[in-house]
């Protein structure tokens, strides 16, 4: 009988500590990730712009 009381007390303690220490994650974190993906795409296009222009010029010379 004592074992069941101790086990239930430990379970309740773990449950209470888990509920208190679990801070809710902010909702805007998802939007920050989306913004980061968009920023990476934009930066990639800016860096690839000169290379695409050179390829376009090379194709026009080949015709």
UniProtKB/Swiss-Prot annotation:
Keywords carried by this UniProt record: Amidation, Antibiotic, Antimicrobial, Immunity, Innate immunity, Secreted, Signal
Tissue expression from the record: Highest expression in fat body and hemocytes. Is also expressed in Malpighian tubules and to a much lesser extent in midgut. Not present in silk gland.
Pfam families xref list: Cecropin
Localisation per UniProt entry: Secreted
GO (cellular component) term, any one: extracellular region
Sites of Leucine amide modification: 61
One GO BP annotation of this record: defense response to Gram-positive bacterium
InterPro entries in alphabetical order: Cecropin
Signal peptide: 1-22
Propeptide residue interval(s): 23-26
Primary localization: secreted
Family indicated by similarity: Belongs to the cecropin family.
Task performed by this protein: Cecropins have lytic and antibacterial activity against several Gram-positive and Gram-negative bacteria.
Protein name: Cecropin-A
Lineage, uppermost ranks: Eukaryota, Metazoa, Ecdysozoa, Arthropoda, Hexapoda
């Amino acid at each position: 009988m004592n074992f069941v009381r101790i086990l239930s007390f430990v379970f309740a303690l773990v449950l209470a500590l888990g509920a208190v220490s679990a801070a809710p994650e902010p909702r805007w974190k998802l939007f920050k990730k989306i913004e980061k993906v968009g920023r990476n795409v934009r930066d990639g296009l800016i860096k690839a712009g000169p290379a695409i222009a050179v390829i376009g010029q090379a194709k026009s010379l080949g015709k």
